[in-house]
C-alpha cells in the first residue's frame, strides 16, 4: 500500500457485535489495493472490540479509535480527523456493501476528478415488504459529471432522494477545504451534511448501480419504537435540522435560487425522517 491510502473508510461502532463479521467480509470483498479502515468504538458495552481484534489479525490497515459514547456524529468526526486517504467513505456497520462498490466509485472519482462520486442502493426490510431500489431507476438514471447543485436539483425533483453519506465517497481535500463536519448529537445528521456538500461540490457523478443494502430493522437507531420522550427529542432534532438547512440556504443563495425543493422538500424530508408516525 502507498503511504497515503486512496480511500479512508470511517465507521462508528456501538454495540455492533452481531453485525461486524458481515461488515468486515464486505470490506474484504472490496479487494482494494490502497485503503485504511478506521473504526471508532463509541463506548460499546458488548463484545465488539473482541470481534474487531479477531479481524485485525486477518485484515491489514484496520485502525481502532476509542471514545466514550457520544453518538454517530462525534464518532465520524473522530474518524475524519484521523483519516489520511485521498477519498473518504462513511458506511454503517449494520448494512451490506456489495463487491465492487468502492472500486467503481474510486474509478469514477479518479477518472473525472470528482468531489463526490455516488451510487444507488436497495431498501431491505426486516419483515413483509419487498426490497426495492432507494432511487427508482426510471427517476434517477446514471449521469455524467454535473455541478453538485444540478445533481441535487435532479435528485430532489425525483421526490425519492435520500440524504445519506454511505452511498458516496468524498474527495478529502474538498471536505477539508470547506471544513465540513457532522453535527454532534443530531439525529439524521446526514441531511444537512449531504445538502451542503452537494451545494458546495463542483464535480459530482452518479451511477444507478445498486451497491449497498440499507437494512431497515428494529435495532437501527433510526427505527426504534417511539414514546412521548423520543417524540419530543425528535421534534427538537427536526427544529435543529430546519435551522441548519436555512443557514445552508443563506450560504449558497445563487445556487439555492434555482432549486425550489431546497425551500420545501428538504425540510419535508427532515420532518419525515425525524418525526415518526404516531397513528
Question: Which residue ranges define each predicted feature?
Answer:
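Cell-envelope/extracellular polymer assembly enzymes that use nucleotide-activated donors
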Residues: 5-8, 36, 192
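C-terminal subregions of glycosyltransferases and related glycan-biosynthesis enzymes
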Residues: 215-279
Amino acid at each position: 500500500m502507498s503511504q497515503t491510502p486512496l480511500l479512508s473508510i470511517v465507521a462508528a461502532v456501538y454495540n455492533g457485535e452481531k453485525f461486524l463479521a458481515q461488515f468486515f467480509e464486505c470490506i474484504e470483498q472490496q479487494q482494494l489495493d490502497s485503503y485504511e479502515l478506521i473504526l471508532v468504538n463509541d463506548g460499546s458495552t458488548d463484545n465488539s472490540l473482541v470481534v474487531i481484534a479477531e479481524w485485525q489479525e486477518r485484515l491489514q490497515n484496520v485502525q481502532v479509535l476509542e471514545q466514550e459514547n457520544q453518538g454517530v456524529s462525534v464518532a465520524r468526526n473522530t474518524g475524519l480527523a484521523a483519516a489520511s486517504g485521498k477519498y473518504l467513505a462513511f458506511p454503517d456497520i449494520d448494512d451490506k456493501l456489495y463487491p465492487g462498490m468502492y472500486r467503481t466509485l474510486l474509478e469514477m472519482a479518479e477518472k473525472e476528478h470528482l468531489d463526490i462520486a455516488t451510487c444507488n442502493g436497495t431498501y431491505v426490510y426486516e419483515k413483509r415488504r419487498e426490497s426495492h431500489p432507494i432511487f427508482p431507476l426510471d427517476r434517477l438514471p446514471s449521469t455524467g459529471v454535473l455541478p453538485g447543485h444540478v445533481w441535487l436539483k435532479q435528485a430532489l425533483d425525483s421526490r425519492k432522494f435520500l440524504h445519506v453519506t454511505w452511498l458516496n465517497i468524498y474527495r478529502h481535500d474538498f471536505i477539508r477545504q470547506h471544513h465540513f463536519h457532522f453535527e454532534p448529537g443530531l439525529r439524521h445528521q446526514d441531511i444537512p451534511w449531504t445538502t451542503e456538500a452537494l451545494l458546495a461540490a463542483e464535480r459530482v457523478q452518479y451511477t444507478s448501480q445498486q451497491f449497498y443494502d440499507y437494512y431497515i430493522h428494529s435495532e437501527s437507531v433510526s427505527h426504534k419504537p417511539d414514546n412521548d420522550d423520543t417524540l419530543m427529542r425528535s421534534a427538537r432534532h427536526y427544529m435543529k435540522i430546519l435551522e441548519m438547512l436555512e443557514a445552508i440556504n443563506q450560504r449558497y443563495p445563487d445556487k439555492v435560487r434555482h432549486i425550489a425543493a431546497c425551500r420545501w422538500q428538504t425540510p419535508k424530508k427532515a420532518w419525515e425522517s425525524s418525526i415518526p408516525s404516531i397513528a
